[in-house]
Amino acid sequence: MIRPPAAWRVAGLALLLATSAASAQQDWPNRPVQIIVPFAAGGSGDVLARVVAQYLTSSLKQQFVVENRPGGGGIIGTKQFLAQPADGYSVGMSSLSTMSLVPIINANAGYDPDHDFAHIAYIGGSPVVLAANPRTGVRTLAEFIAYSNSPGKSFTFASSGVGSDGQLWGELIASSTGVKAEHVPYKATAQALSDLVAGHVQFSTFTLSSTSPFLHAKSLNGIAVTAPERMSEFPELPTFKELGKPDLVGTTWFALSGPLGMSKDIVNRINQAVQMAVATPEGQARFRRDGIIAQPLNADEFTRFVAAENVRWKSLIERVGLVGAQH
């Protein structure tokens, strides 16, 4: 019996493996897909993840299951989905906070947003709203600044943790307006907003999507928002830009990312499904209601977007002195 040369056997094995891998990619998804959310239930990231999971389940004919893994300012959950096999069955909710803020603020984050991930799909961005407990009597930015100078009054703002997007926006707003406020970090957005409504803290800098139910219920006063222009669902809420603060424009964005090495075909399929979900009348209505701004980006465009955001926010973090502030 004549045996084929070793090189032939190796080539045949490589072809077999490549064919098997291609077949697995074509069959994807043939079992439930996990979306790891590095935040507690109830916040903007969690809500968006569940909305997207519902649409992906419908369009890709397989269950997309949200699992919350909060802690460490988003580091715990982010590192968990980063450590999963790059087979498309475990992806994660990424965000401005976990990609552009935490790795700069926390010297021990342990991951590189530009080189360790497959960035899949941008979902949407929510402007941040400066909100006040009504008992402060603060309704305008001028009143906010005046309140900060009132002797004997507690002046605190809540965020969802040290190094969170809420903290950074709060620090930026304080820096831009020349006020000094004490930061009160919480473990979850829902808990912080509950304490704000109860009057345990005076102000907050959360996303409009998280704060909107309280604004509609008049249990919080909206002072100004970081959107580039007034939102159609909140026409009475002024922008910082129109109030003379053009440096306070931007959104807290949310997206899907996965472990480096994911199949380009799977990445593109998820990206296209997310874009289709956002473009549906139901998706657009939900985004308008919650104050979320959509931006259609393919996977390559989103990857470049993340890199640009990292450069932009590093300079802002340096400005407020938070680079490497957390260990």
Model-derived segments and spans:
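C-terminal lobe and pocket-closing loops
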Residues: 125, 211-279, 308-311, 325-327
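Hinge/capping helix and adjacent helix->loop/strand transition within the periplasmic-binding protein
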Residues: 83-89, 96, 104-191, 240, ...
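Surface-exposed aromatic
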Residues: 286-305
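N-terminal signal peptide c-region/cleavage motif recognized by signal peptidases
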Residues: 18-21
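Bacterial N-terminal signal peptides that target proteins for export
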Residues: 1-12
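Immediate post-signal peptide segment of exported/extracytoplasmic ligand-binding proteins
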Residues: 23-35, 84-90, 145-156, 216-217, ...
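A ligand-binding cleft/hinge motif common to bilobed small-molecule-binding domains
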Residues: 99-108, 172-176, 203-237, 314
